[in-house]
Amino acid sequence: MKNIKSKKRVKELGEVFTPPELVNEILDKLPAHVWHPKKTFMEPSCGTGNFLVEIAKRKLSLGHKPQDVAQSLFGIDIMEDNVRECRERLVKLLGDKYASIINENIECRDALK
């Protein structure tokens, strides 16, 4: 995965993607209680879902049900192509059965408005 899609998008939007290795390094530093099944995660600039996908993988590895994982993840991005890719990645990981939850929870809009 590339860290940028285009120089224009970096300049206009400040769009840079966090590589999965760094995402996992950050997630490793979180305390154990954040992985409780009822805890939710909200990513206000989710991009293509690097954080949300890695969070979902961890929750699944802890034995959380895919439906519970889908219901616990929320994301916003201003770019439609990023939102589409984020949704696709989460559906691929969690299953088509949860597409409606994922589509509702991952929104295309400006998180600052």
For every predicted segment, state its role.
Residues 1-113:
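SAM-dependent methyltransferase catalytic region
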